[in-house]
Design a protein with these regions (language model features):
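An internal, short helix-loop-strand segment that often contains or flanks glycine-aspartate motifs
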Residues: 55-57, 107-185
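Structural boundary/hinge residues at secondary-structure and domain interfaces
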Residues: 1-126
Length: 185
């Protein structure tokens, strides 16, 4: 995780599923849960659509066998405007996770008018970009080892790929290490 990112780690795929179900119960928006209001700005649905990631019956049943951990990372939380966020998956099985993500991206391309799915180069590596002309879908997919990132932001994808080589990951930062010493898991 790049040092400049916020980071909400779920610890296990089951915890991620629980949080998704809870936020859906409150209108798909974590802020509704916190403020206990029933307003529905469809932020969760828009972000899901923008990333081209959906939870389906197969992922509910087999997700924990394919994914060991999930984190929400990003640079901002401007949910109304379109945040620079991403879902970071740690794979138990790289092949099955990449197959699932790529299948969802192909389905999203077919479903969205004018959607374009293309390979792009980011920091000398291969990435996948799925986008529509109006940016209702804008999704970069990059892989580094057993980590798979689906993000709305090219910059976030670049930083994700660069961070390990630069030793500037969030986990290496003094602030993060201090916070973990004060509030261990």
């Amino acid at each position: 995780v790049p040092v400049e990112c916020f980071y909400a780690r779920f610890g296990a795929f089951g915890n991620f599923q629980w949080m998704r179900a809870l936020t859906e119960e409150w209108g798909g928006d974590l802020s509704n849960l916190i403020t206990q209001r029933g307003l529905n700005y469809e932020r969760g649905q828009r972000t899901e659509r923008r990333l081209a990631l959906k939870e389906n019956e197969l992922s509910k049943a087999l997700g924990a066998a394919v994914i060991s951990d999930v984190a929400l990372i990003g640079l901002d939380l401007y949910m109304q405007e379109g945040p620079a966020i991403g879902l970071l998956f740690e794979a138990r099985n790289n092949f099955l996770l990449s197959q699932s993500i790529n299948q969802q991206r192909q389905e999203a391309q077919r479903a969205a008018p004018g959607a374009k799915l293309e390979d792009v180069e980011i920091r000398g590596g291969k990435a996948s970009l799925l986008s529509t002309p109006d940016q209702t879908v804008r999704s970069f997919y990059v892989v580094s080892g057993s980590y798979h990132l689906v993000t709305t932001s090219r910059y976030l994808a670049e930083r994700f790929l660069a961070a390990p080589g630069e030793k500037t990951t969030l986990g290496d930062s003094d602030g993060f290490r201090y916070a973990r010493s004060v509030m261990p898991v």
